[in-house]
Amino acid sequence: MDSSSYLVDDSGQAYEAKGLSDGKLNSAWFEGDDSSGLGSWVKFDLGGTKTVSGMKVWNGYWYSQDQWSRHNRAKDIEVEFSDGTKESFTLTDNMTAEQVRFKAAKATDSVQIKLKSIYRGSTFNHTGFSEIQILDQS
């Protein structure tokens, strides 16, 4: 797993990409840019070619309802596969896990998700996800 950047908060807590697949909704990946993170990305290495059909996304910081509303959430995302093809999606602004389906099942060895636009949080200008699960048909 890789990312364009990640946030380290004032207490030294690092919000790295590995937080996206740890099974814990109270952890997260946040981009570490000085702005809202447009163009930032996170990349899942699938460990070989897998056939993927979509993903399940826990958008924003699910530590609590309060923290979810205070941080930015992704609105528009671009998903890129290892062959360079891309698909775009608009996520909802709800604290519910969202299933995203690709146009067709795709053989790929990586899935990269790029932030294209956001829903603004009430306090913090960082954007992230608590969990992302790649749906593998292999």
Regions found by a protein language model. Give the residues of each.
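N-terminal start-of-chain detector that recognizes signal peptides
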Residues: 13-18, 27-29, 49-53, 84-86, ...
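Residue-level signal for well-ordered alpha-helical segments
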Residues: 21-23, 32-33, 56-58, 89-90, ...
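A short beta-strand element within beta-rich, extracytoplasmic domains
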Residues: 50-68
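Disordered, acidic Ser/Thr/Pro-rich linker "stalks" and the adjacent N-terminal cap
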Residues: 1-45
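Beta-strand residues in well-ordered beta-sheet regions across diverse protein folds
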Residues: 45, 53-58, 80, 114
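Sequence-level detector for tyrosine residue identity
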Residues: 6, 15, 61-63, 119
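Trp- and acidic/polar-enriched beta-sheet ligand-binding modules for extracellular glycan
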Residues: 36-41, 63-138
